[in-house]
Swiss-Prot record:
This is Zinc finger protein ZIC 4. The keyword DNA-binding applies. GO terms for biological process: central nervous system development; regulation of transcription by RNA polymerase II. It is found in: Nucleus. One of its GO terms (cellular component) is nucleus. Binds to DNA. PANTHER family: GLIS FAMILY ZINC FINGER 2, TRANSCRIPTIONAL ACTIVATOR CUBITUS INTERRUPTUS. Residues 20-60, 282-334 are annotated as: Disordered.
Length: 334
């Protein structure tokens, strides 16, 4: 049986060589222009799909040569050997009339469902626009409006072209609609940190595996890492309290429990509720169907949006706080 198969293959190979000689002598092309209908006897395996193959699979690994099939299907798990590659090149040249150097351009196979996934895999080009108001000698500053494809390019442009070097005496943010409204910073690094609010740059990633959080300031990253390490370096300053906190802001909020100070007051008209902790105020605001303005949990200052100095509750809490501090001072002096 094996001898009979070998004999058949030799006859087909001999027939193929004779066909090449005849076509090359009568045509000036790189290879014979045999159509799929005229050569089934030479390469029957190239035109007959195996029964177990589905339309979404490549045929015999010849997908890369422009043969009909799903051009976006996954490649074979094992690359073909040198003999298979040479046979494939010869077959493609015979079927399409292309030489070996032109096979890369012959990929116009019928588009299958994989074309959609190829489109989805294309990277989405983003444009980052510089909205710095640059003075150009006129009364009204003009918008920079330069576009960049990466965050690094935008940040470098703003830092070098607009913020400037040490020769700049006034560290003012001229970003469009900046809420500081021309109020200068005391140092250049503070201005650079502030600009990240506008650009969205967050150059400080969490180093712990699987976290994935990034931060705009190194101080915030330092505080965040304590959630992984469990470090709580800020101890409550009141005697007898062993509570510890990861940042000074949480410790300050906790201190209101000891002083009876309630600086977080409800801003809704007619409501005089006040609380010692902002979380209690957030729960209360749900009664009104509102939520207090968001504030960073890493700020050491009390959120001004939540404090009402004119409130009676706030005044009473300040009096109670002063009395508690005075009593504690008297105890320590004794």
């Amino acid at each position: 049986m094996r001898y009979k198969t070998s004999l058949v293959m030799r006859k087909r190979l001999r027939l193929y060589r004779n066909t090449l000689k005849e076509s090359s002598s009568s045509s000036g092309h790189h290879g014979p222009q045999l159509t799929a209908a005229s050569s089934p006897s030479v390469f029957p395996g190239l035109h007959e799909e195996p029964p177990q193959a589905s339309p979404s699979r490549p045929l015999n690994g010849l997908l890369r040569l422009g043969l009909p099939g799903d051009m976006y299907a996954r490649p074979e798990p094992f690359p073909p050997g040198p003999a298979a590659r040479s046979d494939a090149l010869a077959a493609a040249a015979a079927l399409h009339g292309y030489g070996g150097m032109n096979l890369t351009v012959n990929l116009a196979a019928p588009h299958g469902p994989g074309a959609f996934f190829r489109y989805m895999r294309q990277p989405i080009k983003q444009e980052l626009i510089c909205k710095w108001l640059a003075a150009d000698g006129t009364a009204t500053p003009s918008l920079c409006s330069k576009t960049f494809s990466t965050m690094h390019e935008l940040v470098t442009h703003v830092t070098v072209e607009h913020v400037g070097g040490p020769e700049q005496a006034n560290h003012i943010c001229f970003w469009e609609e900046c809420p500081r409204q021309g109020k200068p910073f005391k140092a250049k690094y503070k201005l650079v940190n502030h600009i990240r609010v506008h650009t969205g740059e967050k150059p400080f990633p969490c180093p712990f595996p699987g976290c994935g959080k990034v931060f705009a300031r190194s101080e915030n990253l330092k505080i965040h890492k304590r959630t992984h390490t469990g470090e709580k370096p800020f101890r409550c300053e009141f005697e007898g309290c062993e509570r510890r906190f990861a940042n000074s802001s949480d410790r300050k909020k906790h201190s209101h429990v000891h002083t009876s100070d309630k600086p977080y007051t409800c801003k809704v008209r007619g409501c005089d509720k006040c609380y010692t902790h902002p979380s209690s105020l957030r729960k209360h605001m749900k009664v009104h169907g509102r939520s207090p303005p968001p504030s960073s949990g890493y700020d050491s200052a009390t959120p001004s949006a939540l404090v009402s100095p004119s409130s009676d509750c706030g005044h009473k809490s300040q009096v109670a706080s002063s009395a508690a501090v005075a009593a504690r001072t008297a105890d320590l002096s004794e």
